Amino acid sequence: MKKITGQVKLQIPAGKANPAPPIGPALGQQGVNIMEFCKQFNAKTQAEAKEALIIPVVITVYADRSFTFILKTPPAAVLIKKAAGLHTEKKKGSGAKKPGKEKVGQITRAQLEEIAKKKIQDTTAASLEACMSTIAGTARSMGIDVVG
C-alpha cells in the first residue's frame, strides 16, 4: 500500500482542466505531474463538458508523486440552476439577491427528484425523500420555487 502524502479538493469545469490557477499551484505544491492530471481529468469529464458543469474532484497524492482522483457529482446549486434554466457559470451570479423576498425561477418536483437521484451518492441523506428535502432547501435559499 502506498503512503498518502496529501489530498487536494478542487471544483473544476468539466473538460476544462489546465495548468493555470487554481489547479497548477494546488497540485504543484504536492509534486504532482499537472499536465498528466489535466489530461486524465479532461478525458473522464468529456461527457459533462457539453453541459458546462462544474465537477468537484478529490485528488489523493502518494509519496512516490503518483496520484488518484475521484470525481463527485456537480454541486446541487449548479444542478438547480441548470434545471431552472439559469446561467451556470460562477461569474454570472444567477441566484436571487434577496432569497426570502425575490424569486428568480422555479423547478418541478420531477426535476427535484432527478437532481436528488444524482446527488444521493455524495450526501449523507438516509433516503431519496431526505435528499430531496435538502435540495429543496438549497433551491429556496437561492430564490427558486419548487412547484408540483
UniProtKB/Swiss-Prot annotation:
Record note on modification: One or more lysine residues are methylated.
Family annotation (InterPro entries): Ribosomal_uL11, Ribosomal_uL11_bac-typ, Ribosomal_uL11_C, Ribosomal_uL11_C_sf, Ribosomal_uL11_N, Ribosomal_uL11_N_sf
One of the record's GO cellular component terms: cytosolic large ribosomal subunit
Keyword RNA-binding: yes
GO molecular function: large ribosomal subunit rRNA binding; structural constituent of ribosome
Keyword Ribonucleoprotein: yes
GO BP annotations listed: translation
Alphabetical keyword list: Methylation, Ribonucleoprotein, Ribosomal protein, RNA-binding, rRNA-binding
Function: Forms part of the ribosomal stalk which helps the ribosome interact with GTP-bound translation factors.
Classification via HAMAP family: Ribosomal_uL11 (MF_00736)
Subunit structure: Part of the ribosomal stalk of the 50S ribosomal subunit. Interacts with L10 and the large rRNA to form the base of the stalk. L10 forms an elongated spine to which L12 dimers bind in a sequential fashion forming a multimeric L10(L12)X complex.
Matches recorded under NCBIfam families: L11_bact
Family: Belongs to the universal ribosomal protein uL11 family.
Protein name, entry field: Large ribosomal subunit protein uL11
Gene that this sequence comes from: rplK
